[in-house]
């Protein structure tokens, strides 16, 4: 569990923002959502493979040159 020390004379909103940032960096919420329900190993593999294909297509789209517009 990430924890922060609230500095002296630090506004509450700033401390909350720092806490949210540390939680985001640790990936706690994404792991919590992933573990909320049981996912069979086969569906997990399929989901990860589909995400890898999607990432690869996205990377290829960014590498290709746009068509000439003349």
UniProtKB/Swiss-Prot annotation:
InterPro entries: Ribosomal_bS21, Ribosomal_bS21_CS, Ribosomal_bS21_sf
GO CC entries: ribonucleoprotein complex; ribosome
One function term, GO molecular function aspect: structural constituent of ribosome
Region feature Disordered, mapped onto this chain: 43-70
Swiss-Prot/TrEMBL GO biological process terms: translation
Domain of life: Bacteria
Cross-referenced Pfam families: Ribosomal_S21 (PF01165)
Ranges of Basic residues composition bias in the record: 45-61
UniProt KW keywords: Ribonucleoprotein, Ribosomal protein
Gene3D superfamilies: Ribosomal protein S8 (1.20.5.1150)
NCBIfam families in UniProt: S21p
Family: Belongs to the bacterial ribosomal protein bS21 family.
PANTHER family documented for this protein: MITOCHONDRIAL 28S RIBOSOMAL PROTEIN S21, SMALL RIBOSOMAL SUBUNIT PROTEIN BS21
Protein name: Small ribosomal subunit protein bS21
Source organism of this protein record: Dechloromonas aromatica (strain RCB)
Lineage of source species: Bacteria, Pseudomonadati, Pseudomonadota, Betaproteobacteria, Rhodocyclales
Gene: rpsU
């Amino acid at each position: 569990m990430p924890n922060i020390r609230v500095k002296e004379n630090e506004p509450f909103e700033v401390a909350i923002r720092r806490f949210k940032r540390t939680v985001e960096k640790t990936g706690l919420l994404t792991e919590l959502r992933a573990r909320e329900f049981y996912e069979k190993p086969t569906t997990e593999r399929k989901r990860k493979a589909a995400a890898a294909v999607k990432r690869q297509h996205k990377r290829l789209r960014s590498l290709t040159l746009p068509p000439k517009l003349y």
